[in-house]
């Protein structure tokens, strides 16, 4: 697990964010999480062109309600690696690559000891 940046001043997120780089396949993605109460873990899945920091307030609302939260910069989004040289491009060769990203995020949730059950809150993609 390699620490990754988290821009708290932009996110308006709760304290205690842990951000890490993960590398499913050839691309590096960024995952952030907050460990809170024992009500379970909400997996916040941002939409296309979005980043972890956009969901800081939502994470704060969930943490205040006793949920842990984990979220992701999908490959080609936020601070994650891109497949093409253009930093504004979010291209993937196959949608299955997003499944690899999700698998890596779930493995990080397990590694971090984030509580069950898991809930999904997603936008766009």
Predicted regions and their residues:
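Alpha/beta-hydrolase fold nucleophile elbow
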Residues: 113-124
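Proline/glycine-enriched tight loop/beta-turn segments at coil->beta junctions
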Residues: 35-41, 67, 114-116
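Structural cue for short, hydrophobic secondary-structure segments
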Residues: 44-47, 71
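Conserved alpha/beta-hydrolase
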Residues: 52, 59-85
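Donor nucleotide-sugar binding loop of glycosyltransferases
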Residues: 27, 51
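An N-terminal hydrophobic leader/cap segment in hydrolases
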Residues: 1-23, 29-34, 120
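Active-site glycine-rich loops that stabilize anionic/oxyanionic intermediates
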Residues: 39, 47-50, 125
């Amino acid at each position: 697990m390699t620490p990754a940046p988290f821009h708290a001043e932009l996110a308006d997120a709760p304290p205690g964010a842990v951000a890490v780089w993960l590398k499913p396949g050839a691309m590096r993605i960024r995952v952030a999480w907050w460990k809170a109460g024992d009500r379970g873990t909400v997996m916040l899945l941002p939409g296309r062109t979005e980043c972890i920091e956009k969901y800081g307030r939502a994470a704060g609302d969930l943490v205040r309600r006793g949920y842990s939260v984990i979220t992701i910069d999908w490959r080609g989004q936020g601070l994650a690696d891109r497949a093409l040289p253009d930093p504004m491009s979010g291209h993937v060769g196959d949608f299955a690559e997003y499944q690899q990203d999700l698998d890596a995020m779930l493995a990080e949730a397990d590694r971090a000891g984030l509580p069950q059950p898991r809930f999904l809150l997603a936008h766009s993609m």
